[in-house]
C-alpha cells in the first residue's frame, strides 16, 4: 500500500483500514505460531502498513 493512497482516504476509512490490518496481523501471528504460515514476508508487510496508516492518522489529527 502506497503512502499517497493512504493520505487520500478519510479519517473514518483509515480507522477501518487500521482495524482490518490489526486483525490480519493477529491471524498471521496465529498461523506462524501453529506453523501454517508459508509466506513469512506478509508479517513485515502488514506491520509496515499499520505504521503507515497510524502515521497518516497522526498527521491528520495535527491538522
Curated annotation (Swiss-Prot):
Q: Which Gene3D superfamilies match?
A: 1.10.287.310
Q: Output the Gene Ontology terms for molecular function.
A: structural constituent of ribosome
Does this entry carry the keyword Ribosomal protein? yes
Name one process (GO BP) from the record: translation
Keywords linked to the UniProt accession? Ribonucleoprotein, Ribosomal protein
Family statement: Belongs to the universal ribosomal protein uL29 family.
Family matches, as NCBIfam families: L29 (TIGR00012)
Record's PANTHER family?
A: 60S RIBOSOMAL PROTEIN L35/50S RIBOSOMAL PROTEIN L29 (PTHR10916), LARGE RIBOSOMAL SUBUNIT PROTEIN UL29C (PTHR10916:SF0)
Provide the protein name: Large ribosomal subunit protein uL29
Q: What is the protein's species of origin? A: Chromohalobacter salexigens (strain ATCC BAA-138 / DSM 3043 / CIP 106854 / NCIMB 13768 / 1H11)
Amino acid at each position: 500500500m502506497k503512502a499517497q493512497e493512504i493520505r487520500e482516504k478519510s479519517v473514518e476509512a483509515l480507522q477501518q483500514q487500521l482495524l482490518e490490518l490489526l486483525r490480519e496481523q493477529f491471524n498471521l501471528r496465529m498461523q506462524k505460531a501453529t506453523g501454517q504460515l508459508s509466506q513469512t514476508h506478509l508479517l513485515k508487510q502488514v506491520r509496515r502498513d499499520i505504521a503507515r496508516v497510524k502515521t497518516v492518522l497522526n498527521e491528520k489529527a495535527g491538522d
